[in-house]
Amino acid sequence: MSCEQHYRTLIDKYIDGEATAEERQELNEHLETCDACFEYMLEVRKVVAFVQSASHVQAPEGFTENVMKNLPKRKQTNRFKVWMRRYPLAVAAAVFVLLMSTSLFSMWSSDGEHVTVTGTGNVSIDQESGRVIVPEGEVIQGDLVVRNGELIIEGEVQGNVLLVNSSQYLASPGSVSGEIDEVNQILDWIWYHTKKFLTKVIDISDEKNSPSS
């Protein structure tokens, strides 16, 4: 049995929590000298972290039942599990596109044309004119999201600003400490959340980059 086959089997057992103490020690010693197996371990960990992080995203009601009804009857096998470990990045991308696109499209469609604001602090909202005003002297702690309005910042936002179908006016430079993103189409909306979600996934996977963790 080759190095790749033997130690990838050990990696699979380690990820599933089925490896013995002797096998874990053998694997750790091998990973110190084998870059290929170490990279494979990192890829599998990233897939696990990705799926765990995406567990809060829900598909539309009845989605699972409709899919199961159309599936052909077949004996249960471990082919998907093997394929997932062989192509972890492809599986991660497929899961992300399916769940996130469905959820984000639903969120985008439900926004309507009303002016809405997400954030903490004293913000003035005028539904008729569509103006959202951060008054002079007011400091918004955290991120601010404005939908279908015109954001006028006379105070300060200590965080990021997301404008969805909105425009902005800054009374003074530096009034926003974070980034300002404008989203005016559904593809921009999906791309914004894609970047935000993948950033979280990378942060989680970086924390788990050691086999002994």
UniProtKB/Swiss-Prot annotation:
PTMs per UniProt: Is processed by three successive proteolytic events. First, the extracellular region of RsiW is cleaved by PrsW (Site-1 cleavage) in response to cell envelope stresses. Next, it undergoes cleavage at an intramembrane site (Site-2 cleavage) mediated by RasP. This cleavage uncovers a cryptic proteolytic tag with conserved alanine residues in the transmembrane segment, that is recognized mainly by the ClpXP protease, which completely degrades the protein in the cytoplasm and leads to the induction of the sigma-W-controlled genes.
Membrane topology field: Single-pass membrane protein
Keywords of this entry: Membrane, Metal-binding, Transmembrane, Transmembrane helix, Zinc
Topological region Extracellular: 110-213
Coiled coil: none
Residues holding Zn(2+): H30, C34, C37
UniProt GO cellular component terms: membrane
A GO molecular-function annotation: metal ion binding
UniProt remark on cofactor binding: Binds 1 Zn(2+) ion per subunit.
Cofactor: Zn(2+)
Residue intervals passing through the bilayer: 87-109
Topological region Cytoplasmic: 1-86
Superkingdom: Bacteria
Family indicated by similarity: Belongs to the zinc-associated anti-sigma factor (ZAS) superfamily. Anti-sigma-W factor family.
Function of the molecule: Is the anti-sigma factor for SigW. The presence of RsiW leads to the inactivation of SigW, and its proteolytic destruction to sigma-W activation.
Protein name: Anti-sigma-W factor RsiW
Organism: Halalkalibacterium halodurans (strain ATCC BAA-125 / DSM 18197 / FERM 7344 / JCM 9153 / C-125) (Bacillus halodurans)
UniProt lineage: Bacteria, Bacillati, Bacillota, Bacilli, Bacillales
